[in-house]
Every structure is written in structure tokens, then in C-alpha cells.
Amino acid sequence: MTVRGRGPERPAHLARRDFLAIAGTGLAGGTLAATGVTGLGATPALAAEGRPSPAVAARLRVGYTMPTLEFADPNTRSALGAAYESALTDLIGINTVYAEPSTYDTAGLLSYPPGTVVRAGGGYPSPQRWTRDAAVNAWNAASLVSPLVGRNTLLAMVEKRPDGSLIVQQDNQWWDQIIWVVSAWNHYLVTGDSAFLADAYQTSVNTMSARQVQNFNAGLGLFEGPSFMNDGIAGYPSPPWEPGIKSSFVLDYPNTNKIMCLSTNCLYYGAFLALDGMARALRNTGAAASYRSDAARLRDAINKHLWRTDAGSYGYFVHGAGQLSGQLDTSEEGAGLAFAVMLGVANPDQARSLLDNAHWEPRGIVNSWPAFSMFSDQKPGRHNVCVWPMVHSMFGHAAAIGGRTDLFARAVTDLARLTLGSSGDFYEVYNSKTGAVDGGWQTDGSGELAHFTSQPSQAWSATGYLRMIYSGLFGLNFTENALRFAPCLPTGWGQLSLVGVPYRNATFDLTLTGAGNHVVSCTVNGRPGQAALPAEATGHHQVRITLDEG
């Protein structure tokens, strides 16, 4: 069990621009020239971890391909380019680390080489075998830019049970486990790795079965457990928070194991759909149909118990025990709203409404809102009215999916500015009013409010930005039989290109012109066609898409 909080001082690591210079990259002529860097040694992060020297680590290759982001408009380049450079460096040069077999390969599933995984980030002690961070980072970007590292990062979270069967590592943060299923299905869609699919399906079936037995509330049709993001008590109002408890961990507070949260239940819905997809891909039609039915019932329950018709949005959680049992907490949960749109829990009308009504702070989307009674503008709650870039980025992607080009533009530029204000580093948490690096306030082991540290070089903050670029701006939508393009290009950003993108056995360059999210025309290698590449594509392809507001 790991609660994100205080940690040791930041480890030394290779400077961002130094890393990209070594990798043969740079920032010139409107181009982040980071194309096609493969076989790149993982030595910067290894050094930061106290791992083998470059000579010893030479055999440990990460195999990344870093797509180039090209800008026709210098203002757009100035606003967004440095953050893209920093995000790639954070993922590849800082947070890709050696996977010590005794720690990370307990199930015997990792590949050596590359022998690396994506860790959570700076400031926290090693090892960082954290399911939630691993799944988010693979889902956001790692599975695309390095399928082998993405695969290792996911499989490092798997353990073998005494009977030899596979399951996501079991601990007392059970609500973290199910996002692994969503991320694993995405990895298969991106890579087409059938060997991975077989292990992922077994792992996902066993993980879901365990959670259904232990954490499903049959009366309400929802899964119990804290919010996806909020393992710290600062993410909850009173109740369940109460004074005098000497802990920051959510489960140390009464009845928190019984709450039923929007974000977590949306992820279970996504996991059921992922299991349906995996089962179909493995030709297990009976299991697929069962998982589809489970998904439909859960979606109905979420919309019955958590949708607020009066507010045109979702509430945060349903109390599962105590005096408020059965009542909906009406706070707004940033990750929950994002997942409701991203995973399809919200119908189109609901998605439009919640995007219209979502609360923005001056520097972005926050973890939860409004401020709970124990916090204030001077002492913002760590998991309350603070900007976590990972959550903010998920909401940005949701805005793109929902066709809100304006909100998507705001999300991307807000995070780029936060990063610029913190010397190009992707920190863990920011003050939602000022944009300063700020870990927020939370009850600690003394039972009193304490100011926590915002840790540097957090991989999921960086991959969140990459998610907004790859999946939001360029609209990379991976399906079983094709990569489909659904871009979201804000007005005034000018022509943009993503060059050298890997997709299974092919690569492609994608150029966007116009503005909006409606595809007016698409050419593939100069010929008019659908905005898609088939999964069986090979070689290199040129894709050009013209957009308007529709």
C-alpha cells in the first residue's frame, strides 16, 4: 500500500534538454525533432535509481520511438512545444528504469531486454510497483511509444497465485486494481500483441472475479471502495473525514470501504467492456456476452444512483454505511466526470451537459470541488481543490471526445503553462489559484492538518500531457481492426503534424489543417479515403486531415 505524500528529496537526474540532445533531438525551425529514436539506453533513469553504470546497462534497451510534433504557427509552438519536449524526457529519460527481476518480475512475464518499466516518478522511494500509476502511464502513452516497455510496465503488476493462475497484485487498495484491465485492453488494441492478450485476459478475469466477490454491492448494483484518485483523506468531505484520526490514509476513516464512487465505478464499467473485447478477440463468445450484460447493468446503476438531473452532472459518491447510507454526496469529482465521458457511461446529452457544467479553477480542473469544510484558499486540500495534472489531462481528453474544442484547448494550454512555471518539470500537484507547485494540505499522522510535498518528475503528469496530444489533439483511437482518427484542433493553432508515429507493423505521419473536430476530408498517401489505417498496415504512410466545426 502506498499513499502519495511526503517523500525524500528529489534525486539527481539528467537535465531535460541534455537528454534530448544526447538522443539526437532538438527544438528548431518549429519542430521537436525526436523522431524514430529507438534502442535508446535507459541509463539516465538507471543512474537516478542507483542502478548499473552505462557500461553494465548497455544491454538494457528501452526501444522507444518518439514522434515529432511540428508546428506551422510559431505562437502555438511557443505555447505547447516545450511541454511536449519535457513530457517525452520525463517518460523516457527520467522515469524508465531497470526492472529488478526479484521485485518487478515475480510472475516471470517480463521481457529482458528491454528489462525496463515506467516508474511513478521522482521523490518517492524505490521500488515503485504501483498498479494505478503503471496502468495510467501505459494507457496514456507508453504502450504507443514503446510497446515492450508498456507491456513490461503492465505485467510487472501481475502476480501468480499458488495454483499458478495470474491476477493483478493484491493489496488493501483494491480499487486501484481494475484500471489495469482497461489499460491492458488498450495495450492490445495499440500493439496487436496476441501473446500479451492471453495473459491479460486470464489476469483480468481473475481480478474482476475477486472484486465482484469482495466489493460488489448487489443492492445498489455498484462497486464499493474509495475514489480512483483519492487514497488520501483530503479527497473526501465530512463524513467520512472526521477530526482526531491520526492518519492520511482513506481506509483509516469510518465507512470509507463502503462508499461507491463515480470514478471507480466508471472504471469497472470500462473493465467489463475490456473483458468483453478480450473474450471476443479470443473467440469466447459466451463470456463476452456475459461481460457485456454486466457492463450494461453497471452503467444503468451508475446513472440511476449518481446522475444529478438538477445539476446536469454526476455526484461524487454514494454513502454505503452509517447515518448517510444510500445518500449521494453532490461534490464534483474531476476524474469521475472525465471517465464518464471517456468510457461511455454518459450518453451524448449527459456528456454535453457535464462538460458545460464542470467547474474550472483559474489554473485547471481540480480533483474534487467545492472546498471541503476543513480547507480554504490558504490551505487547499491535497486531493480537493488542487490541480493534479493526471486528472486534468483526463478531463482534457474527455473534452476532446465530447467535441468541446474550446475546453480541450484550455486544458492543454493550462497544463503547458503550469509546466513552464515549474521550470519545465511535470510536478505532482499544483495550486489551483496561483499555479504554484503545491502539495496541498491533509490530515497526517499527528491528527492535524499538515502541508504535503508536491513531488517532481511525475510520469503520469507527463504522460497525461502526451495523452492530450496523441489521443485528444490528433485523435488516435485504437480499435481491434484499425487505428481511427478523430482529431480535435482548436481554432488559431494552425497546421500541426505528428511525424513518425508507430502503429503495429507500420509508421505514419499525420497532418491536421483547418480547425474543429469534424473531418471534412482525409487523404492517405495522397488518395482520398477514410480517416483510418487498417491494423494490418505495413510500411510508412502519409495521412492528411482537414477539419471544420461541423
In which residue ranges do the predicted regions lie?
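Acidic/polar, glycine-enriched structural segments that form the non-catalytic walls/loops
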Residues: 44-127, 194-196, 205-212, 279-287, ...
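Long alpha-helical scaffolds in large eukaryotic adaptor/regulatory proteins
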Residues: 30, 148, 191, 279-282, ...
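N-terminal secretory signal peptides
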Residues: 1-18, 25-29, 33-34, 38-44
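Short helix-capping/linker segments at secondary-structure and domain boundaries
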Residues: 32-38, 145-149, 345-351, 403-406, ...
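Non-catalytic C-terminal accessory modules of carbohydrate-active enzymes
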Residues: 394, 398-550
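Extended glycan-interaction surfaces of carbohydrate-active proteins
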Residues: 74-127, 148-170, 217-259, 300-389, ...
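Active-site neighborhood of glycoside hydrolase catalytic domains
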Residues: 265-305
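Aromatic-rich carbohydrate-recognition surfaces in CAZymes
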Residues: 127-242, 261-269, 386-399, 405-408, ...
